[in-house]
Amino acid sequence: YVALDKGYYEAEGLDVEIVEPTDGATATLVAQQKGTFGISYQEDVTIALTAEDPLPIKAVATIIQHNTSGFVSLADSGITSPADFEGKTYAGWGGPGESAVLEACMTQAGADFSKLNIVVSDGSGFEALGKSCDLMWFFEGWDCVMAAMNGCELNYMELRQLDERL
């Protein structure tokens, strides 16, 4: 957005329009030629390329060097590791890899995954914490920043610190 606002694209002879589609996943929209390229997360691309009917897309670059996401809870909740997830409610996006990551992290921490209640998030972000759910999966550079800007203190459990495979 800043580059567009400052005219950097135009200075290089590029006519750029930034579109934020809400109807569909990034990989699907690019495959349907509703965008020239998209910026997405690794799991979206992996699923698109390994599906029974793979999407005609190609990953060409990474923007960040490592996973910058993790689980969050309210700072005063007492939930500071996956060992604390038992008996709690997790709100997520319902992606196919989501449960597998939760289960792996909980198992590694000695917790019973079957004791975690999983619901689909209503999209309200950090505002849902402590109300409709106890924990969520946030992207540090976006969701955690937004929560901090709104005075919401969080416990952040970075995925790559919870399991080296992540």
Located regions from the model:
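Pocket-flanking alpha-helical
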Residues: 1-3, 19-58, 68-82, 99-103, ...
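Short coil/turn segments
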Residues: 74-78, 93-98, 140-141, 159-164
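Short loop->beta-strand "edge-of-pocket" segments that line small-molecule binding or catalytic clefts
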Residues: 83-96
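Short beta-strand-to-loop elements that line the ligand-binding cleft
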Residues: 15-22, 39, 111-123, 156-157
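Pocket-lining segment of extracytoplasmic ligand-binding domains
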Residues: 124-127, 131-166
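Short beta-strand and adjacent tight-turn residues that come in two discontinuous sequence segments
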Residues: 21, 39-40, 62, 92, ...
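A structural signal for short loop-to-beta-strand junctions that line the ligand-binding cleft
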Residues: 55-64, 88-91, 155-163
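Ligand-binding cleft/hinge of the Venus flytrap
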Residues: 1-14, 99-118, 146-153
